[in-house]
């Protein structure tokens, strides 16, 4: 639930704020899988892995202040006050936050990965929400979900694996435009 108590999720607002502050990050998790075209249920949060250098964490802290981020807890729907700076952000491996724009999780070293630099190597930049968005490679998302082993992650694995196979096949066997045109004319 968001700070305002609504069920709204505004990924565009969160991403635009991160980008405006120059935060270096990679989107991970369900939203990243959806941006790759995986047909999984729509997510209500954003998970990111930020670069951990001090300057980037200071920019992230400024973005979190602008987003009015608070620590997410089941007992306090609007979240707990969250005083932070770059140094304090680096003291945890995960921050589960809530904002007026939706839930926002920071995972510095997602399961099955070595963190930002590891994910960045194969990340893709996609245009979404009117922004350029760095998104973890689908195979890295799969690797992380397998390592985490949570029931909700295991549930999505068959869909993610199928999507990964489809994307790999499209990269390895691109069809020529005239083949697509012929298929359309024939009703294929």
Model-derived features: where do they sit?
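Compositionally biased terminal segments of proteins
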Residues: 1-188
């Amino acid at each position: 639930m968001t700070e305002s108590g609504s069920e709204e999720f505004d990924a565009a607002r969160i991403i635009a704020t991160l980008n405006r502050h120059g935060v270096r990050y990679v989107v991970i998790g369900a939203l990243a899988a959806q941006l790759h075209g995986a047909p999984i249920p729509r997510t209500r949060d954003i998970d990111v892995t930020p670069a951990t250098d001090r300057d980037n964490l200071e920019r992230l802290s400024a973005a979190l202040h602008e987003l009015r981020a608070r620590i997410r807890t089941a007992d306090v729907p609007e979240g707990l006050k969250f005083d932070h700076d770059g140094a304090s952000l680096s003291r945890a491996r995960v921050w589960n936050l809530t904002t007026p724009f939706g839930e926002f999780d920071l995972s510095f070293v997602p399961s099955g990965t070595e963190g930002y630099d590891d994910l960045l190597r194969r990340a893709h930049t996609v245009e979404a929400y009117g922004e350029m968005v760095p998104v973890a490679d689908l195979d890295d998302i799969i690797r992380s979900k397998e390592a985490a082993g949570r029931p909700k992650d295991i549930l999505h694995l068959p869909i993610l694996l199928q999507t990964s196979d489809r994307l790999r096949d499209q990269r390895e066997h691109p069809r020529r435009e005239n083949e697509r045109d012929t298929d359309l004319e024939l009703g294929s």
